[in-house]
Amino acid sequence: IGTGSGYAAAVLGRLAASVVTVERWRTLADAAHQRLRSLGYDMVETIFGDGYEGHLTRAPYDRIILTCAVSDPPPHLLAQLAPDGILVAPLTAGVVVRTDKADSAARRTAFAVATVDPAVHGVARRL
């Protein structure tokens, strides 16, 4: 969640068979899409949309990684995880947490300290 230049999506594309990345800024989404295609990252699908809402169409996901801070991992994103899926999110409190989904429960583990811009709801047309 949070495509930006597409760098993180490209790295993840080297590790996974397919990657869906969601960006709220159309100009960033379009540029990242073209950049990733030109570099051969056909396994990365770039979506222009409200990343805070995730992308239900392609759910469930094995992993969801946020590049923007949230106060708490949104329940609707956890719901888009596959069984045994993992969500990684920086929190506005300054820590990065890993949330493991197991059956109907979720277990959270803090594993890093980071300061990241907060998530913003909605979409934007241009940067």
Q: Where do the protein language model's features map onto the residues?
A:
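Active-site capping/gating segments
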Residues: P90-L127
